[in-house]
Curated annotation (Swiss-Prot):
SUPFAM superfamilies hit by this protein: Family A G protein-coupled receptor-like (SSF81321)
Protein name: C-X-C chemokine receptor type 3
Family recorded in the similarity comment: Belongs to the G-protein coupled receptor 1 family.
GO CC terms, sorted: external side of plasma membrane; plasma membrane
Pfam families recorded: 7tm_1
CDD domains, alphabetized: 7tmA_CXCR3
Segments traversing the membrane: 56-76, 89-109, 125-145, 168-188, 222-242, 255-275, 300-320
Chain positions covered by the region annotation Disordered: 341-366
Cytoplasmic side of membrane: 77-88, 146-167, 243-254, 321-366
PTM (free text): Sulfation on Tyr-25 and Tyr-27 is essential for CXCL10 binding.
PROSITE patterns: G_PROTEIN_RECEP_F1_1, G_PROTEIN_RECEP_F1_2
Membrane topology (UniProt): Multi-pass membrane protein
Gene name, Swiss-Prot/TrEMBL: CXCR3
Keywords: Angiogenesis, Cell membrane, Chemotaxis, Disulfide bond, G-protein coupled receptor, Glycoprotein, Membrane, Receptor, Sulfation, Transducer, Transmembrane, Transmembrane helix
Length: 366
């Protein structure tokens, strides 16, 4: 997976005569994997839409995502000695989201003009994007599993085990994501299209490889994490519903928002990609109107997915009691001039409660 402008074969109406003289053409998404005997559809409208929409969207997500996840990382690192297992996963999640949005300015330039950064940076940027795309989804699954064990089974897997257990889990997640990104190091390259007189960062492999990569993206980057989150949070809700207290009600609202946000952000994109893949495989009829609609839908829905990187700080940190208390403590430590900072600094008893690892407080204190 790379941002949508890099997954589309650019084509102008002026090239139609050229294509009629050639019996084969790389039909599809900016990769050289599909050959057909009929010329592709003009993509002037979808390309113009991308040149306007994607740079603005990517720039906005870059600023918001870097700022929000940067704040989360700074606040968590300010009290490293007191980090719980969930806090550690949140820290890695913030790093993953920040690194993902860090590549968006490069893809914004690619969408607005062309790829001007060479094949080396093309491979690195594509791999970095995908590593952190997979890491974000898998770390969310780790957080849900950790909370499931803590609340449903009252088991502190990481707290009671060796201190390196959570670190090894994170290393395993990053290693798996690096493995998933190997196709980017191998097949991504900067390619110049003489007909368009433009260069773009694109994949270069057969259609079968492209389909396999999409299946990997769908299963490892969406379906499996979503199933883990849905199962774990459904069991958590079953426990919380039979309990009472305002704290647990807040926890119940939070776990519902977590799953809904992930599903709403990424489900539309994967549905559109599924339709596009079925069109590539011939299972769905391809026509110019449908192709243009799918191209635009991929751009819009992928933007919705990337927005999840900006939502994570809000859902997992700013909504959490423990994070807000840590943030005020950090502001006081840095010498916040506003008297309200001192007024909102938590008392010792409140800090002790929110840092506890009991079944009730450990989740609501996220």
């Amino acid at each position: 997976m790379v941002p949508e402008m890099s997954e589309r074969q650019e084509f102008q109406a002026s090239d139609f005569a050229y294509l009629l003289e050639n019996s084969s053409y790389d039909y599809g998404e900016n990769e050289t994997y599909f050959c057909c005997t009929s010329p592709p559809c003009p993509q002037d409208f979808s390309l113009n839409f991308d040149r306007t929409f994607l740079p603005v969207l990517y720039s906005l997500l870059f600023v918001l995502g870097l700022l929000g996840n940067g704040i989360v990382a700074v606040v968590l690192l300010s009290q490293r000695a007191a980090l719980s297992s969930t806090d550690t996963f949140l820290l890695h999640l913030a790093v993953a989201d920040a690194l993902l949005v860090l590549t968006l300015p490069l893809w914004a330039v690619d969408a607005a003009i062309q790829w001007v950064f060479g094949s080396g940076l093309c491979k690195v940027a594509g791999a970095l994007f995908n590593i952190n795309f997979y890491a974000g989804a898998l770390l969310l699954a780790c957080i849900s599993f950790d909370r499931y064990l803590s609340i449903v089974h009252a088991t502190q897997l990481y707290r009671r085990g060796p201190p390196t257990r959570v670190a090894l889990t994170c290393v395993a997640v990053w290693g798996l994501c690096l493995l998933f990104a190997l196709p980017d190091f191998i097949f991504l390259s900067s390619h110049h299209d003489n007909r368009l007189n433009a260069t773009h960062c694109q994949y270069n492999f057969p259609q079968e490889g492209h389909t396999a990569l999409r299946i990997l993206q769908l299963v490892a980057g969406f379906l499996l994490p979503l199933l883990v989150m849905a199962y774990c949070y459904a069991r958590i809700l079953a426990v919380l519903l039979v309990s009472r207290g305002q704290r647990r009600l807040r926890a119940m609202r939070l776990v519902v928002v977590v799953v809904v946000a992930f599903a709403l952000c990424w489900t539309p994109y994967h549905l559109v990609v599924l339709v596009d893949t079925l069109m590539d495989l011939g299972a769905l009829a391809r026509n110019c109107g449908r192709e243009s609609s799918v191209d635009i839908a991929k751009s819009v829905t992928s933007g919705m997915g990337y927005m999840h990187c900006c939502l994570n700080p809000l859902l997992y940190a700013f909504v959490g009691v423990k994070f807000r208390e840590r943030m005020w403590v950090l502001l006081v430590r840095l010498g916040c001039p506003d008297q309200r900072c001192h007024q909102r600094q938590p008392s010792a008893s409140r800090r002790e409660s929110s840092w506890s690892e009991t079944t009730e407080a450990s989740y609501s204190g996220l």
